[in-house]
A protein has these predicted regions:
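Generic hydrophobic, helix-prone segments enriched in Leu/Val/Ile
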Residues: 25, 101, 110, 171-172, ...
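Solvent-exposed residues in well-ordered beta-strands and their adjoining turns
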Residues: 132, 149, 176-178, 192
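Short beta-strand elements
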Residues: 197-214
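Short, aromatic- and glycine-rich surface loops/edge beta-strands on solvent-exposed regions
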Residues: 183-194
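Short edge beta-strand segments in beta-sheet-rich domains
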Residues: 96, 157, 199-203
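Intrinsically disordered, low-complexity Pro/Gly/Ser/Thr-rich segments with frequent PxxP/GP/PP motifs
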Residues: 142-143, 153-182
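Substrate-binding clefts and catalytic carboxylate motifs of secreted carbohydrate-active enzymes
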Residues: 1-141, 148, 156, 164
Length: 214
């Protein structure tokens, strides 16, 4: 059941391939680590899918009317015991990608755009904050609050108040920080209405690489 290697021609993958698993695309193209157990591989592949689903869905949301006019997720449910792109398996059990899609599809979305592709210790990196209101009602005097943290240390934080018009999307702020260690950086961003109720929340984690060799 557990193949000896990640090689696509390893006969151990034959049964997996029957169920649509693609070892070459998974391990060589997407560069997803297999892990030491099936459970670790499931966690690694689901994490990759969740990150990709969130990145794509949020990107399309930010491109509203420029040129995106509608958004449909493919694919949602597996129709048989398939190792594929569905975010819900054939037993109707949600994968990590389902919850990523749920967050990216919030009607009022505090979107986090990754500007810097690779974060490195000691180098500046940037994310861009957006506020998207895909409802037919204005969010009057909404409060936007954000925070960037690394290993318990706050690298940046801030807040602002503004009205989000109905059917709108706005670029709010670019945030540039310098990670000081190899620990992951977490960006937290939320939108509250004037009564203090959270109407949208989001979080993004950035892995930090070593400084480039001199």
């Amino acid at each position: 059941m557990w193949p000896k290697s990640t090689a696509a021609d390893d006969p151990g993958w034959t049964h997996w391939k029957y169920h649509n698993f693609q070892p070459f695309q998974t391990f060589k193209f997407a560069n997803i680590p297999r892990g030491n157990t099936i459970q670790e591989m499931i966690a690694n592949t689901q994490r990759y899918q969740a990150e990709l689903v969130a990145m794509a869905a949020e990107s399309y949301r930010r491109q509203r009317y420029q040129p995106v006019t509608a958004l449909f997720h493919f694919m949602f449910v597996e129709t048989w015991p398939s190792i594929n792109w569905g975010v819900v398996d054939y037993l109707r059990k949600p994968k990590a990608g389902y919850y990523a899609l749920q967050k990216a599809y919030q009607p009022i979305l505090p979107s986090i755009e990754p500007v810097t592709a690779v974060w490195r210790q000691g180098s500046e990196a940037t994310v861009r904050l957006w506020a998207i209101n895909d409802t037919w009602s204005a969010c009057e005097a909404c409060r936007l609050k954000w925070q960037v943290k690394q290993n318990g240390r706050v690298l940046a934080k801030g807040n602002t108040s503004l009205t989000l018009p109905p059917d709108s999307g706005s670029r709010i702020k670019d945030i540039t920080v310098t990670p000081t260690t190899r620990h992951n950086v977490t960006i937290e961003y939320e939108i509250s209405d004037r009564a203090g109720n959270t109407v949208g929340s989001n979080q993004r984690n950035e892995r930090v690489e070593s400084p480039p060799e001199q």
